[in-house]
Design a protein with these regions (language model features):
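Outer membrane beta-barrel transmembrane domains
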Residues: 204-296
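Surface-exposed strand-loop-strand hairpins of Gram-negative outer-membrane beta-barrel proteins
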Residues: 47-68, 104-106, 161-166
């Protein structure tokens, strides 16, 4: 059962981490697992509405259906005596996008591998590296946790510089984040996360060199633990920034948006867990007004 609990926590972090990175909702991302835990993740997400892989695309009146399958591997480590996780994830995306390009209707169906993501997280306070027995004791008397993570997104996805819509972004991205978990009781937790996502340049974008300012994000989660491996949460985030420059021209696409979501995770067999998640746009200034469903 402890391993099933660890899997349920890490599965959500892995799948959400390869959504649009600044928009992700990741409850319990820094909750520890026993050292030596290994998790294979198979997941699926569906998003419908005003959503694009890349909001710099000059497409208006967007109506998309985006699907993503995910294969990921999670390894729990002990770094400097602290509980840590290494996550490697490879998504495959497919879907259809419709909209207007200079008042002309346009659409495209697409499928292919998106960009590879690698994340390393370390719990700096409150969660040392633990055996299964120590983890069981921690779960019954949890302490406040301070964690940090670094995610690298590599430009490995499929990309065609003659197309507006691509599966890969053709640029490097780096996200740093701090997370804090505050136990209110053995059943209730509060999660807080703050991060910054930095982008490299895309020198082959169809409309000219593309540059983008960082996107800053904050999350809060209210979590209820029902039994070992079974928990639910209400999730909220806010993200801002990300103004883009295309061929030297600044766009008016600064994001100041937020999303609301809910998550349920429960064990289905020894060493296995199922996660269901749903999120919607709440406050939308630019893009991100879409519904998303997740299952792993």
């Amino acid at each position: 059962m402890p391993v099933a609990l660890a899997a349920s926590v890490l599965i959500f972090a892995a799948l959400a981490a390869h959504s649009v990175a600044a928009q992700e909702l990741t409850p319990r991302a820094y909750w520890p697992a026993p050292k030596g835990t290994k998790v294979l993740v198979i997941g699926y997400s569906n998003a419908e509405g005003d959503v694009l892989f890349d909001p710099s695309i000059p497409l208006y009146g967007v109506d998309s259906e985006l699907n993503a399958g995910l294969l990921a591997y999670v390894q729990t480590l002990s770094l400097w005596g602290r509980s840590s996780n290494l996550i490697v994830e490879l998504p495959y995306v497919w879907g259809e996008t419709r909209g207007l390009v200079e008042d002309t209707p346009a659409s495209r169906k697409y499928s292919g591998f998106s960009d590879l993501g690698i994340t390393l997280s370390v719990n700096l306070m409150g969660a040392p590296s633990m055996t299964v027995e120590e983890f069981v004791a921690f779960r019954t008397d949890p302490h406040a946790i301070l964690g940090a993570s670094l995610k690298v997104i590599a430009p490995t996805g499929e990309y065609d510089e003659t197309r507006l819509i691509n599966e890969g972004a053709n640029r490097w991205a780096l996200k740093g984040e701090l997370g804090y978990t505050l136990p209110l009781s053995t059943k209730w937790l509060l999660d807080f996360e703050a991060g910054a996502l930095f982008f490299g340049d895309d020198d082959e974008f169809v409309a000219g060199k593309k540059e983008q300012e960082p996107i800053y994000s904050a999350q809060m989660h209210v979590i209820r633990r029902f039994s070992p491996g079974f928990w639910g949460s209400l999730n909220f985030n806010y993200f801002t920034g990300g103004r883009q420059t295309i061929d030297g021209v600044e766009l008016g696409d600064v994001q100041r948006n937020s999303r609301l979501g809910a998550t349920f995770v429960f064990p289905v067999a020894k060493g296995h867990a199922l996660k269901l998640g749903y999120a919607v746009g709440w406050l939308t200034r630019f893009g991100t007004d879409f519904d998303q469903f997740l299952i792993t």
